[in-house]
């Protein structure tokens, strides 16, 4: 089957530029970011510099100030391009085949495999905190990307998508409800500033129940929509639309529905907009037309595309030598390897990106708390942003939104795994000590962001478009600004100074 994943090179440049600009906007804004632990002693607090968790930069501070910082900027842009290529050519095609093989709907695929793959950097960061850096793997790591993922990435999907996607009520309601439960669970666990092994296991159990819910999503959604439709009009409309589609097309699999309702040419060819497959109508029914995509080493014809192709050739070669291209017929059966290898490369490129961003922030003299809420947060969320925007541009709004919320659920609940390992095996004699100062404010911020997202989608007519993108951007900037003011002590009583200052 042929795959046409990815935007054109011109659009890719635009995406990378916007992602780079977004790195300087206040993001996440709920607590200290990953790799920014708080050291407590008596009644004072201090923030350990995020640079302490990374190797030294290539240049001295003076050399960086004299022009070496330009190299850091170029590496950051190059890593953004590398992440985009991995997601475009390997990660999303493997996800498509996995979803098709398991018969998953768009929203379920987005909330499970897509969320897990794009959130791999956060999980790797947590394990590094357990086994290598010995840093705080508490509240800052769990809640770091919440507001940005919920509102910031949704804004990016709406503003950068070239088509309007119709959203379903049930997937958003399901994921937001589970996320609210996750927030409550974490609130209860870290309220006493200590984490025990059974509490980490409890988070894993909740995530297991969430996966079980997704496995029976079709049956559960029908029951919920039938029961709640009298009091919830949006659920009633969702049920009517699903019944109409199944009655009209005679297919119950949503992935097949998506293929059939995309477009129909005069020659009788059904073709999915994403280019995943071509279906031709014959006397024997639908027959599949297979064709491998062009080689990644084929030079584009346009001059601008050639320039970017040459620049990205080292990354293209590295990926071609290490990761099977499951879009091609020969490697199609190796899609599981493609999925895990692409997630591994996403984690590696994200680590380098965040490392360079940290060194850049140190060179520019940005305070640690502000840098954690801006540069580091945006860097670690680049994979989620790229994957969500790419699928939104293909018209798969449910998959994009489910990935946005599902990534938060994955980050929060699956961090019970490193907690469980640390308390049950690595250091079984003592619980994990975490800092829950400001927990009430954080919980309120998360619940407000969940409510804002659901209401924004509802009042926008359940459409993912530029209007929704603007609304989410305004809401996000407002909450993020308040969070930055809270962290630097302008509002509240939570001023954090740098350790050693």
UniProtKB/Swiss-Prot annotation:
Its main location: Golgi. One of its GO terms (cellular component) is trans-Golgi network. One of its GO terms (molecular function) is calcium ion transmembrane transporter activity. Pfam families: Na_Ca_ex. Residues 88-111, 158-170, 216-305, 356-362, 422-438, 492-501 are cytoplasmic. Residues 1-29 form the signal peptide. The chain crosses the membrane at residues 67-87, 112-132, 137-157, 171-191, 195-215, 306-326, 335-355, 363-383, 401-421, 439-459, 471-491. Highly expressed in melanin-producing cells such as skin and eye compared to other tissues. Strongly overexpressed in melanoma cell lines. Expressed in dental tissues. It is a multi-pass membrane protein. Keywords: Antiport, Calcium, Calcium transport, Golgi apparatus, Ion transport, Membrane, Potassium, Potassium transport, Sensory transduction, Signal, Sodium, Sodium transport, Symport, Transmembrane, Transmembrane helix, Transport. GO terms for biological process: calcium ion import; melanin biosynthetic process; monoatomic ion transmembrane transport; negative regulation of melanin biosynthetic process. Residues 30-66, 133-136, 192-194, 327-334, 384-400, 460-470 are extracellular. Disulfide bonds: none annotated. It is found in: Golgi apparatus, trans-Golgi network membrane; Melanosome. It catalyses: Ca(2+)(out) + K(+)(out) + 4 Na(+)(in) = Ca(2+)(in) + K(+)(in) + 4 Na(+)(out). The keyword Nuclease does not apply. Calcium, potassium:sodium antiporter that transports 1 Ca(2+) and 1 K(+) to the melanosome in exchange for 4 cytoplasmic Na(+). Involved in pigmentation, possibly by participating in ion transport in melanosomes. Predominant sodium-calcium exchanger in melanocytes. Belongs to the Ca(2+):cation antiporter (CaCA) (TC 2.A.19) family. SLC24A subfamily. This is Sodium/potassium/calcium exchanger 5. It comes from Mus musculus (Mouse).
